[in-house]
Amino acid sequence: MRKTNLQNPQLNLSDFQDKSLLILDDDDPLRGRLSRAMEKKGFIVKEAKSVADGLQIVKKSPPNFAVVDLRLEDGNGLDVIKELSKNKPESRIVMLTGYGNLPTAVAAVKAGAIDYIAKPADADDVEKALLADPNQKAAPPENPMSADRVKWEHIHLSLIHI
């Protein structure tokens, strides 16, 4: 599982007046566990298990934070990310995916996500990603010859050209 590695400390949830969080995932046990964990951390959680439900929540009351699965039974989580980014540009969105690869990461960021995390998602990693300071760049992995380093460099270069 990928962990967000920041050079400087993250923001605190108390820095945000709006603590609303949408968790969109069709995996009921994962969504339930993550929802409970994020509520304990202070987020006000709304759950959705389909693109249709997620879009309804985003249009009615756009959350400040969102954790969105990429592949859902009724469509693509990128549609929800795009709609939330349009309705609330300052929202902080993290994409969850069991299919972590470079094109997925780039598509998520282009749609408005600030990060992506491979499943199974750990609540601490999700919180770190949601609260990452937008003014700080993610540090590259420590092993300069690792596959993670190569992936990070490629993502970084790809994002420069967005």
Regions found by a protein language model. Give the residues of each.
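Acidic catalytic/metal-coordinating carboxylates
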Residues: 50, 76-79
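Short hydrophobic/Thr-rich beta-strand motif most characteristic of the beta2 strand and flanking loop
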Residues: 42-49, 57
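Active-site beta3 strand of CheY-like receiver
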Residues: 61-67, 72
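Conserved small/polar residues in nucleotide/adenosyl-binding loops
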Residues: 160-162
